[in-house]
Amino acid sequence: TVWFNAVLRGDVHFIKIGNRVNIQDGSCLHTLYGKAPIIIGDDVTVGHNVTLHGCEVKSGALIGMGSTILDHAVVGHGAIVAAGALVLKNTVIGDGELWGGVPARFIKKVDPEQAKELNVGYAQHYVMYSDWYRRSDAHPNTHITAPHRKNMTKLPNGNTSTREIMRKF
């Protein structure tokens, strides 16, 4: 899903987006003229106000709010880029690694099960949000009733909240 005010500029190279990807509000994806497309794998969350520029984000990754990933950078499978991070050009973030800061640096390896639970969980939540939003009883600029908790999509561990997962970090 591509949310409000997100911009995908594939004007000078292509953008390829996998399944169950959510690109949240205000994010900007732009390619590098003739040199660097944007490639995003499956089950990826791109947080609010993220800038992706000519980079690759592999399946199961989570890109935190307000972060920037520059040309030719690669974010590995199940990796996490912390909110507000600046990933410099040509940086390679390994599978299952947590990076953060300005400029972004390696922080730690994340347990693969925890990363999958968190990253895929967020992706699944946004699939649910898009289904809910498209329903006939949800309309913009009117009173919208949120889905009842009992009807929410379950995370892989059976939880309906990511709070428990975040406590593990």
PLM region spans:
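Glycine-rich hexapeptide-repeat left-handed beta-helix
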Residues: 11, 17-19, 25-40, 48-166
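Short proline/glycine- and basic residue-enriched helix-capping loop/turn segments at helix->loop/beta transitions
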Residues: 45
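N-terminal first-folded block
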Residues: 1, 5-9, 35
